[in-house]
C-alpha cells in the first residue's frame, strides 16, 4: 500500500495532469486516509469507513486520467469500470457484483506477483539445479560413480551457465502445463455453482507437466517461474488477497451520469435506476461471493465520476447521493490550459510527435508561437462545436502532422519548424469553417 503523503501524490499527478487541483487534493487525501486507517487499533479501524468521492466535470478535463494515474500510485487493488456496462439483476448483462469479483482477481494477481518476487532467489537456485540435471543426467548405475568427479564437472558447468556460455544450447525439460480456462454462462444468482464447475473442469483437463525442447536461456526463465509458483502457498495467497481487497481496495466508477434517470419514462429502467439500486449495497457495505471466497465491501473506497451534461448529480437516487459525500467539481479547460498540456506533462503530445518523427530521421521543432496557435485552434473548435476538452488536441495535432507523417520516410534528414504561420496554413480553413470543424476536427 502506498505511504505517499497527500502533497507527494498531488506532485506525482501534476506530472501528468494540468490543473484540477481540487480533484487531485481530494483523491490524495482519500488515498492517504487508507494508510492512516491501517495505523489505528483494530477496534477503531473497523469503525472508520471511507468517504466516497463524486467527481463532476465536463468531458476531457482529466477525470479518467486521474483514475489511471491513481491506479499506478495506489499500490493497492484498483479497478476502473464504466457504470454503463452493467444492468439490473435478473436481466441480460453484467451485474454490479462483477466489479468486486474483478477487483478480487486483480488482488490475487497482485499478491501472487509479490510472493513470487519474495521467493525468486530460491526459485533461481532450484531452476539452476534442474538445468544442470538436464545437462548432466545421472547414470543408471550411479552406485559406483566417482562422486568427486561428478561434483567437479557440475561446478564447471554451473560456472559456464552463470557466465552465459551455455545460453544457446538446447535441452529438454518438463515445464508446468498452462491451465485451460472454461467459460460458463450461468443465470443470475448461480455464481457459486459456476465457480465450482469451472474448478472441476480445470482439474479434469489439467496435465501436470509438458516436455519441451528449449534453449537454456529460455528454459531458465520458464523454470524460475515454475519453481516460484510451486513455492507460493495458494490458500495463504487467497486469504491475503481477500484481506487486501477488503481493507485497501479502490473502485473507480466512470460515466456514472449515464445511469441517471432522464425525465418521465415508463417501463423498467434496467440499465439506469436499476443499476443505481444494485450499487447501493456495494457502496454501503455487503458480502459478495467470489471464486476465491467471500469479500466484504464495507471498507472499499468508491470514486465515481461523470460529466453530468445531460443530467445533474441530484438526478441520482437520494440513497446513492448520500453514499458519495465528497463532491469535487473539475473546471473546463481554457486555451492557456491547452498550451500547458502541450508542453508541461511527462511525454506531452509535442514530445511524442518529435520522438516519432525522429525514428524516420526527421527533425521537428515546435516554436512558442506554434504551440500557442495550436492551443487556440483547439479551444476555438471546442467553443464552436462540441466541447470534448483536451481530447480535441489529439485531433488537431493529428491533422497538423498528417502531411509530415505521410512524407517522413522519404524526407530523412529534413527539419520542419512548426510556428504560428505553419499552423495557420494547415488549420486555418478548418478552424474557421464550422461545418468542416464539425466533421474533420
UniProtKB/Swiss-Prot annotation:
It holds the Pfam family AAA_2. GO terms for biological process: protein unfolding; proteolysis involved in protein catabolic process. GO terms for cellular component: HslUV protease complex. It comes from Shewanella frigidimarina (strain NCIMB 400). Belongs to the ClpX chaperone family. HslU subfamily. NCBIfam families: hslU, PRK05201.1. The keyword GTP-binding does not apply. SMART domains: AAA (SM00382), ClpB_D2-small (SM01086). InterPro entries: AAA+_ATPase (IPR003593), ATP-dep_Clp_protease_ClpX (IPR050052), ATPase_AAA_core (IPR003959), Clp_ATPase_C (IPR019489), HslU (IPR004491), P-loop_NTPase (IPR027417). A double ring-shaped homohexamer of HslV is capped on each side by a ring-shaped HslU homohexamer. The assembly of the HslU/HslV complex is dependent on binding of ATP. One of its GO terms (molecular function) is peptidase activity. It is found in: Cytoplasm. The keyword Chaperone applies. ATPase subunit of a proteasome-like degradation complex; this subunit has chaperone activity. The binding of ATP and its subsequent hydrolysis by HslU are essential for unfolding of protein substrates subsequently hydrolyzed by HslV. HslU recognizes the N-terminal part of its protein substrates and unfolds these before they are guided to HslV for hydrolysis. This is ATP-dependent protease ATPase subunit HslU.
Amino acid at each position: 500500500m502506498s505511504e505517499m503523503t497527500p502533497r507527494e501524490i498531488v506532485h506525482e499527478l501534476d506530472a501528468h495532469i494540468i490543473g484540477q487541483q481540487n480533484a487531485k487534493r481530494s483523491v490524495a487525501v482519500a488515498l492517504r486516509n487508507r494508510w492512516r486507517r491501517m495505523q489505528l487499533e483494530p477496534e477503531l479501524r473497523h469503525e472508520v469507513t471511507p468517504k466516497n468521492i463524486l467527481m463532476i466535470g465536463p468531458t476531457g478535463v482529466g477525470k479518467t486520467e486521474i483514475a489511471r494515474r491513481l491506479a499506478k500510485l495506489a499500490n493497492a487493488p484498483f479497478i476502473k469500470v464504466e457504470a454503463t456496462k452493467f444492468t439490473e439483476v435478473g436481466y441480460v448483462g453484467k451485474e454490479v457484483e462483477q466489479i468486486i469479483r474483478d477487483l478480487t482477481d486483480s488482488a490475487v494477481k497482485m499478491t501472487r506477483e509479490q510472493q513470487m518476487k519474495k521467493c525468486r532467489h530460491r526459485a533461481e537456485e532450484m531452476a539452476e539445479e534442474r538445468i544442470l540435471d538436464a545437462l548432466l543426467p545421472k547414470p543408471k548405475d550411479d552406485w559406483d560413480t566417482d562422486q568427486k568427479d561428478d561434483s567437479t564437472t557440475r561446478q564447471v558447468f554451473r560456472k559456464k551457465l552463470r557466465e552465459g556460455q551455455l545460453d544457446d544450447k538446447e535441452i529438454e525439460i518438463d515445464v508446468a502445463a498452462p491451465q485451460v480456462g472454461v467459460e460458463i454462462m450461468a443465470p443470475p444468482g448461480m455464481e457459486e455453482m459456476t465457480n465450482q464447475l469451472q474448478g472441476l473442469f480445470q482439474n479434469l483437463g489439467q496435465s501436470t507437466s509438458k516436455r519441451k525442447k528449449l534453449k537454456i536461456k529460455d528454459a531458465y526463465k520458464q523454470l524460475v517461474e515454475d519453481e516460484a509458483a510451486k513455492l507460493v502457498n495458494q490458500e495463504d495467497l487467497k486469504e491475503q488477497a481477500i484481506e487486501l481487497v477488503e481493507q485497501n481496495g479502490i473502485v473507480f466508477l466512470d460515466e456514472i451520469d449515464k445511469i441517471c434517470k432522464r425525465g418521465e419514462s415508463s417501463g423498467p429502467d434496467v440499465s439506469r435506476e436499476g443499476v443505481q439500486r444494485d450499487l447501493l449495497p456495494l457502496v454501503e457495505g455487503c458480502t459478495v461471493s467470489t471464486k476465491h471466497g467471500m469479500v466484504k465491501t464495507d471498507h472499499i473506497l468508491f470514486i465515481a465520476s461523470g460529466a453530468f451534461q445531460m443530467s445533474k448529480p441530484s438526478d441520482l437516487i437520494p440513497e446513492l447521493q448520500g453514499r458519495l459525500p465528497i463532491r469535487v467539481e473539475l473546471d473546463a479547460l481554457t486555451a492557456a490550459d491547452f498550451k500547458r498540456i502541450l508542453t508541461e506533462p511527462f511525454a506531452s503530445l509535442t514530445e511524442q510527435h518529435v520522438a516519432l518523427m525522429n525514428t524516420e530521421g526527421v527533425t521537428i521543432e515546435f516554436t512558442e508561437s506554434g504551440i500557442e496557435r495550436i492551443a487556440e485552434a483547439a479551444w476555438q473548435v471546442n467553443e464552436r462545436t462540441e466541447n470534448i476538452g483536451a481530447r480535441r488536441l489529439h485531433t488537431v495535432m493529428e491533422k497538423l502532422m498528417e502531411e509530415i507523417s505521410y512524407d517522413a520516410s522519404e524526407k530523412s534528414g529534413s527539419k520542419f519548424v512548426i510556428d504560428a504561420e505553419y499552423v495557420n496554413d494547415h488549420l486555418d480553413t478548418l478552424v474557421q469553417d464550422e461545418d468542416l470543424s464539425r466533421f474533420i476536427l
